[in-house]
Amino acid sequence: MSIFQYTFFQNALLGALLASVACGIMGTYIVSRRLVFISGGITHASFGGIGIGVFFGINPIMSAMVYAVLSAFGVEWLSTKVKVREDSAIALFWTFGMSVGILFSFLTPGFMPDLPSFLFGSILTIGTSDLWLLSAVTVLVALVFLLLYRTIISIAFDATFAQSQRLPVHAVEYLLMALIAMTIVSTLRMVGIVLAISMLTIPQMTANLFTYRFGHIIFLSIIIGWVNCLMGLMLSYWLNVPSGAAIIFSAIIIYMLLWAIKSLVFKFK
């Protein structure tokens, strides 16, 4: 029986496609704006929301999304309004979120069977509700970028100049921070907290081997991310390993191969 006939694998493939679109768009902004460290902080801070959700018996993904968005706003507010150093603000919310998640996880009576899937990802845990959430986030991200594309590009490459042109820089930055948090949390079932940030950076690194145009990077990142996910999911199924690790391993192998091919082409050109 082909693995494509299994419902859980079909869900994983659809989830991978949606995640590739959302991460391809948001990841390009993150890399262009050099927000990788902030995104990593938000990713790990979201564990606080998972712990709270498990403890109070609510959907951990939804509570993680709320917690991640609030953490993103907190980092932005501390660094811009309170003038706390950005790396210090990130470290504060990163460590606080992880500590809250660990405390509530240990305070929850009984065993927490979903914990490894939240940390490392699992194709078996991607359900219909996760697909609906991913769909909603992907549509929202795509709509925002379609409506605010020129403004986002201006902010991504020169926020100071964008502000001098009376563009709503701060409002758009808060909106994009919220979208980053939502995108990260919506992919947790697939790649896990530990590796989620890689979905937002490695496809963009690979796309950068061939183009530097913002729109082209988005397009290539979506395709590359989709291929990475396909290979990773197949590897995860065959080797019975966490899908997150398999996807990121495949992504890095693809990046290294393409980098080597490009280097050889230029060498013998």
Task: Describe the function of each predicted region.
Residues 1-21:
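Membrane-interfacial amphipathic/re-entrant helices at transmembrane-helix boundaries
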Residues 6-11, 82, 90-150:
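Transmembrane helix-bundle core of multi-pass membrane transporters
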Residues 13-18, 61-66, 91-92, 131-136, ...:
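Hydrophobic alpha-helical transmembrane segments
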Residues 15-24, 45, 49, 53, ...:
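Alpha-helical transmembrane segments in multi-pass membrane proteins
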Residues 28-111, 207-219, 236-239, 263-264:
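Short loop segments and helix-boundary regions at transmembrane helix junctions
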Residues 130-202:
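Helix-loop-helix "hairpin" substructures at the membrane interface of multi-pass membrane proteins
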Residues 190, 194-245:
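Transmembrane alpha-helical segments in multi-pass inner-membrane proteins
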Residues 241-248, 252-269:
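Cytosolic-side transmembrane-helix boundaries in multi-pass membrane proteins
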